[in-house]
């Protein structure tokens, strides 16, 4: 039901910014986002030439697979959350103020994120071709456990959305909002864009 409603939204946002010239492969990636009383709803739409989902355990390095990511900072305290998913919905959730002090969340907290994958739940090695997949997420506000968020209406968060694949045949790093670092690094809250819940 959530997936179908996100499909019906009039606006999809593209993850299409290439920030690092040595990584010039760009898959087709977009997302739809909405919110409810206690959840953020997010759906990624991906079309790429290389696809992998080998990680099956919570908090494994899913960025080494085909990976979609949502980094979000709910308040101006410098703390952000990085939610990273492979095509079968395996999730890494970290939180901190930088890459250096980021800590993994408790798997019990992560288990509250509802996930629906078009790729099923079984792991697979790299596939090649003209490959399409989607991932729908329902992220409860309690996942943002450093912050006491009661509701979203009227709130403004800072965020960025990413697609990567560190260990694919052709690695790639694509962003929604531009990132101005010399090398690929998504842990850059100063380059987050604005996310308004109207």
Name the predicted role of every residue range:
Residues 1-198:
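Structural preference for beta-rich elements and adjacent junctions enriched in aromatics
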């Amino acid at each position: 039901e959530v997936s179908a409603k996100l499909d019906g939204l009039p606006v999809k946002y593209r993850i299409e910014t290439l920030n690092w010239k040595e990584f010039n492969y760009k898959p087709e990636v977009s997302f739809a986002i909405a919110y409810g009383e206690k959840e953020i709803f997010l759906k990624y739409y991906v079309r790429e030439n290389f696809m992998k989902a080998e990680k099956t355990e919570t908090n494994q390095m899913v960025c080494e697979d085909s990976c979609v990511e949502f980094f979000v900072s709910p308040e101006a305290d410098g703390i952000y959350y990085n939610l990273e998913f492979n095509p079968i919905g395996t999730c890494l959730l970290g939180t901190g103020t930088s890459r250096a002090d980021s800590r993994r969340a408790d798997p019990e907290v992560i288990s509250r994120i509802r996930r629906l994958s078009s790729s099923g739940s079984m792991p697979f090695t790299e596939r090649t071709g003209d490959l399409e997949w989607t991932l729908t997420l329902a992220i409860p506000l309690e996942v943002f456990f450093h912050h006491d968020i009661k509701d979203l209406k009227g709130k403004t968060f800072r965020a960025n959305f990413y697609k990567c694949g560190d260990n694919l045949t052709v690695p790639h790093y694509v962003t929604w909002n531009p990132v101005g670092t010399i090398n690929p690094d998504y842990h850059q809250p100063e380059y987050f864009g604005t996310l308004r819940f109207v």
